[in-house]
């Protein structure tokens, strides 16, 4: 599954079950991405809110295309749309 993008960032909270599932899904697909812990980095937390309009995680940023507060099925659908 190849999506050619400049920047893929996943904003997570370490205790978030959906975040762990998103990490697992991206890792299984062999996606290179930056994992950002918004609890450890207040600036990243503020950026996540600015990008998504909410404070819920996970938030995926693929070259400015944002998927927020999602589960594995929504992630798979989002990824398919990116491949087109």
Task: Name what the model sees in each region.
Residues 62-84:
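Non-catalytic, surface beta->alpha helical segment in thiol-disulfide oxidoreductase systems
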Residues 17, 43, 74:
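Short alpha-helical
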Residues 52-60:
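Structural micro-motif
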Residues 17, 40, 67:
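Glycine-/small-residue-rich active-site loops that bind phosphorylated ligands and cofactors
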Residues 32-45, 55:
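Thiol-based oxidoreductase modules, predominantly thioredoxin-like and allied folds used
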Residues 1-29:
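Local sequence-structure signature of Cys/Sec-based thiol-disulfide redox active-site neighborhoods
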